[in-house]
Amino acid sequence: MLFIAENGAYAAAGRKEWLLLDMDHETVAGLIAGIRCIEGTCIVLAGRDSAYIEDKQPEFVREARKYYTRCQEVGDLLDVRGDKLLKIAVYDFLGAGENSYPRLKHLEHGFQVAVSGEKWMDISRKGANKGASLELIQRKLGISSEETMVFGDQMNDASMIRQ
């Protein structure tokens, strides 16, 4: 079974990686600096090997651990090194669609920006989305949409389900 994760920035089957669309540390640092200025938000830095959080608010930690089984608490997200950085997930206590997305949608010219749930939004490398990743994998495997089964549970799965 092949899994497409982190908004399409990563795909793997067992130990075989099919796709990895990471972001460089400087880019991620700039994004984190901007997000930290938005009231009511907490950040998950999603890497290939683990997710990283610095905020310790109980509701946020509970929500982050619900979606990331490998989740490390760190003193500062900017100190994370040695992992491929795939996505920044923003948890917004005030509602992603109403609060953080309007303040971050200007990033869409250079990044994939998606509201992924009532309180979640994601920022990843431009072109990283589950539909495009699925299409690439279908081409590599020589299979059609009719021969593909997908499962999704959030708004960021829509492009994959349509594919």
Language-model features, listed with the residues they occupy:
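Conserved acidic, metal-coordinating active-site core of Asp-based
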Residues: G30, G34, I38-F151, M155-M160
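Alpha-helical substrate-recognition element adjacent to the catalytic core
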Residues: M1-H25
